[in-house]
Regions:
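Anaerobic metallocofactor- and corrinoid-dependent redox/one-carbon enzyme cores
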Residues: 1-198
Length: 198
């Protein structure tokens, strides 16, 4: 398993470690963890106490991929987003996960639909647009004709629709084949789009 458990002790350890390294490097390092699943408000409180900067916070992901009770998780998300908004924590949403399980061209509209839903749910909870890390991912087949232009168009569309949001743009994973040269090119194209549409 990757990552760390979402406990207050782990949040404290990570914050202290990143502050130490940040002091050595002369810059601030953000700490990110997840605030999802069955304990969203509780995790949001712990993250706020320990000074986390970013939290993955998306009930729709749990409904679609984990079969979590819809009503309960949407209420949990509402409470956790109130807490994250008050604490100044940026939330990340999970739209990139849709594209790892579906064709990124055929399902492109689902990402925008989910972003729009997540934006409205965040606004209802009082979360400012500047704290909405709405999700997207660079997951189209790299062999697709004009695929780079489609990726650029999708990213630019998200930037124009959500101009104040610190969008979460995820790098390519599904079509990383082990061809190192091609993988570096895919990462470079992803970075280029991220910079162009910032």
């Amino acid at each position: 398993f990757g990552g760390t458990y979402a406990t207050q002790a782990n949040f404290k350890i990570m914050r202290e470690a990143m502050d130490k390294v940040g002091e050595e490097l002369g810059r601030y390092i953000r700490v990110c963890n997840y605030c999802s699943g069955l304990c969203m408000p509780e995790i949001a409180i712990m993250g706020a106490f320990e000074g986390l900067d970013v939290m993955l916070n998306d009930a729709l992901y749990g409904i679609l991929f984990r079969d979590i009770n819809m009503q309960r998780t949407l209420i949990d998300q509402y409470m956790s987003r109130i807490i994250n908004g008050f604490a100044g924590v940026i939330i990340n949403t999970g739209e990139d996960n849709y594209l790892t399980t579906a064709d990124a061209v055929e399902a492109a509209h689902t990402v925008l639909a989910s972003d729009l839903i997540n934006e409205q749910l965040a606004l209802l909870a009082g979360l400012p647009e500047e704290q909405m890390g709405l999700g997207h991912a660079f997951e189209m087949d790299p062999m697709l004709d004009n695929g780079f232009l489609y990726e650029l168009a999708q990213a630019q569309m998200a930037r124009e629709i959500f101009p104040k949001a610190p969008l979460k743009y995820m790098p390519p994973t599904k079509f990383m084949t082990g061809n190192i040269f091609r993988g570096h090119l895919q990462d470079a194209l992803f970075n280029m789009i991220g910079i162009w549409t910032n």
